[in-house]
Amino acid sequence: MIHPSAKIHPTALVEEGAVIGEDVFIGPFCIIEGSVEIKARTVLKSHVVVRGDTVIGEDNEIYQFASIGEVNQDLKYKGEATKTIIGNSNRIREHVTIHRGTIQGCGVTSIGNNNLLMVNVHVAHDCQIKNNCILANNATLAGHVELDDFVIVGGMSAIHQFVIVGAHVMLGGGSMVSQDVPPYVMAQGNHARPFGVNLEGLKRRGFDKPTMHTIRNIYKMLYRGGKTLEEVLPEIEQIAETDSAISFFVEFFKRSTRGIIR
């Protein structure tokens, strides 16, 4: 079903059964195949390919030669029914690839709202990107990676499969990340190592000084106190009972399976 207000260039190919919403623009030489739904006011500039069971939300801008919902690169994948879901108000730049999920994972590759994926970013199967993240040019996420809100991934960085990156993390350019990165941390290197709290990012997002002070203290407990995570976690849980910003740490450590960067 194609909404009457949608504009589709004559050279674009839209397979029967696709759902194209109000005021959607599909530019020259785009290809839409499979059970695709594109919601209101989303723009596909040109040469964009969208395949499979894919839902793209409202007000997205998708630039030329992006590929969304394509068959993933997991050798175990045998054509099972899996999905790709993209939220609202994302900017997906040239040559970005976003692959559908696998049944061995959660079955869905998902991207939330207000994210910027710069040129040549790769998002592999079963990745979960939340909201307000920035992935700079040539950043690569392996399968099952999770990015929480407000993560910044520097250009040419690569994140190992199953890694979790906590909220408000900033990864410097060229980072190789093989373990989980706790919330609020700045990290860089091969392999990535922590080098402080993302204070500038927290200021921009309205964190007050007492909260930032508490976050810095948690960072010192994790990385400068000479204790293991198991030893400091009860102290962090106690602080989190009265400070919601610190609850991010507790929730993160409950999800972490690969150990944290050191």
From Swiss-Prot:
Claim: Manganese is one of the keywords in the record: no
Catalysed reactions, semicolon-separated: a (3R)-hydroxyacyl-[ACP] + UDP-N-acetyl-alpha-D-glucosamine = a UDP-3-O-[(3R)-3-hydroxyacyl]-N-acetyl-alpha-D-glucosamine + holo-[ACP]
Location in or out of the cell: Cytoplasm
Gene3D superfamilies with a match to the protein in the record: Hexapeptide repeat proteins, Udp N-acetylglucosamine O-acyltransferase, C-terminal domain
Primary subcellular site in the record, as a coarse category: cytoplasm
Function (record text): Involved in the biosynthesis of lipid A, a phosphorylated glycolipid that anchors the lipopolysaccharide to the outer membrane of the cell.
Similarity comment: family membership: Belongs to the transferase hexapeptide repeat family. LpxA subfamily.
Entry protein name: Acyl-[acyl-carrier-protein]--UDP-N-acetylglucosamine O-acyltransferase
Native source species: Haemophilus influenzae (strain 86-028NP)
